[in-house]
Amino acid sequence: MIPGEVIPANGEVVLNKGRRMVKVLVAHTGDRPIQVGSHFHFAEVNRSLHFDRQEAFGMRLNIAAGTAVRFEPGEEKEVDLVEIGGKRQIYGLNGWTDGAIDDENLPSFLASYQVSEDKEDEEK
């Protein structure tokens, strides 16, 4: 055995069983590549990535832990998202959530995102 080696059991391993999953079409309108990690709250990614943030609220990329998806400028691609598990609390990142990722906090998230978008427009 090699240190860190993973030897899976025979058969298939089902990941994220019972969690809600969605597909989201993402368009990158910025001028620099953007990389999003596996456990980042997808609704809070860079504003140069355009997609339905309401649909992505409380979701992360459905990819292996420690990996990422890269978005090149001008690129449009569909990604698979899965519900964030655990205590379902998000703090930090872009500061648009800072609390529970539930239906009750969705309006607050959308308002925070809009305020940050308006500030960015004013700076241009």
Curated annotation (Swiss-Prot):
Keywords: Cytoplasm, Hydrolase. It comes from the Bacteria. It is an enzyme of class 3 (hydrolase). It is found in: Cytoplasm. InterPro entries: Urease_beta-like, Urease_betasu_sf, Urease_subunit. It catalyses: urea + 2 H2O + H(+) = hydrogencarbonate + 2 NH4(+). One of its GO terms (cellular component) is urease complex. The keyword Cytoplasm applies. Pathway: Nitrogen metabolism; urea degradation; CO(2) and NH(3) from urea (urease route): step 1/1. Pfam families: Urease_beta (PF00699). SUPFAM superfamilies: Urease, beta-subunit. Its EC number is 3.5.1.5. GO terms for molecular function: urease activity. GO terms for biological process: urea catabolic process. Belongs to the urease beta subunit family. Heterotrimer of UreA (gamma), UreB (beta) and UreC (alpha) subunits. Three heterotrimers associate to form the active enzyme. PANTHER family: UREASE. This is Urease subunit beta. It comes from Halalkalibacterium halodurans (strain ATCC BAA-125 / DSM 18197 / FERM 7344 / JCM 9153 / C-125). The lineage of its organism: Bacteria, Bacillati, Bacillota, Bacilli, Bacillales.
